């Protein structure tokens, strides 16, 4: 089962739209909490921990079929028949997979800076850095940073990963399952061959300085999502929702409100 948290609007009514928010690799549901806060007046939100992340279950060989089943079970548990879905990076691929296999349950799809394609291995340094952190001997976050930085050189990436480090009693732990993520990585950067199309409204939000979605991906996107539109947030990279949150959140809210009017 997936761990999730519900954020209902302050003036909750049954006609308010629902939005499921799915984070990226090495993240947790907290990563997209700022979006839920920004939409709190108009949109009910469900924040999800992916398997092997946060408080969700550990799965040794995770793939998109596993994530899809978790999302299906979560909607059933919540009593929701339809919702909008928003995913960033790995979460975007999970949201796309869900939409393509559960069109009637996905009112619309919002994909943040990822495409429905297979990607090359690009996290080797991150894996090496995480495995280099000796949780049994570190005594502070500074110790962890020193060990992590032997392989991970970019300060923003270092700080993002260290958000997943916490102290439980006398031991340090990650909020994600490093070994299981590494084992599942080939399946997660891959993209399966899918014949279905998702014909409901679809919005791709792309970082203007990011290389995760390029013109070369347009054909793959349109073949699966014929009812697609795209917005580019200039001056942002892959972490577009964190770099320009006000712009990102307005795009998301405008998309949902237009469909709800």
Regions found by a protein language model. Give the residues of each.
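Conserved serine/cysteine hydrolase catalytic core
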Residues: 170-224, 232
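The conserved beta1-alpha1 loop
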Residues: 20-24, 206
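Catalytic histidine-centered segment of alpha/beta-hydrolase-like enzymes
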Residues: 236-245, 249
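Conserved alpha/beta-hydrolase catalytic His-Asp/Glu region
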Residues: 121, 136-192
């Amino acid at each position: 089962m997936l761990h999730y948290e519900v954020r209902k609007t302050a003036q909750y009514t049954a006609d308010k739209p629902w939005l499921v928010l799915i984070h990226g690799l090495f993240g947790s549901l907290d990563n997209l909490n700022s979006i839920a806060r920004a939409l709190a007046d108009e949109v009910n939100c469900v924040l999800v921990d992916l398997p092997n992340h946060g408080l969700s279950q550990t799965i040794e060989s995770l793939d998109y079929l596993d994530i899809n089943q978790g999302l299906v079970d979560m909607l059933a548990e919540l009593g929701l028949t339809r919702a909008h879905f928003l995913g960033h990076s790995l979460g975007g691929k999970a949201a796309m997979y869900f939409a393509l296999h559960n069109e009637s349950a996905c009112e619309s799809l919002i994909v943040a800076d990822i495409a429905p394609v297979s990607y090359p291995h690009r996290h080797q340094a991150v894996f090496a850095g995480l495995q280099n952190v000796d949780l049994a001997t570190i005594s502070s976050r500074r110790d962890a940073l020193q060990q992590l930085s032997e392989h991970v050189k970019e300060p923003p990436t270092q700080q993002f990963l260290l958000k997943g480090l916490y102290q439980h009693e006398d031991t340090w732990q990650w909020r994600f399952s490093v070994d299981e993520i590494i084992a599942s990585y080939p399946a997660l950067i891959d993209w399966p061959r899918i014949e279905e199309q998702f014909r409901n409204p679809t919005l791709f939000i792309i970082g203007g300085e990011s290389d995760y979605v390029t013109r070369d991906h347009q054909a793959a996107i349109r073949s699966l999502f014929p009812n697609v539109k795209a917005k580019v947030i200039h001056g942002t990279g892959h972490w577009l929702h964190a770099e320009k949150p006000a712009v990102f959140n307005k795009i998301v809210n405008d998309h949902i409100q237009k469909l709800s009017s």
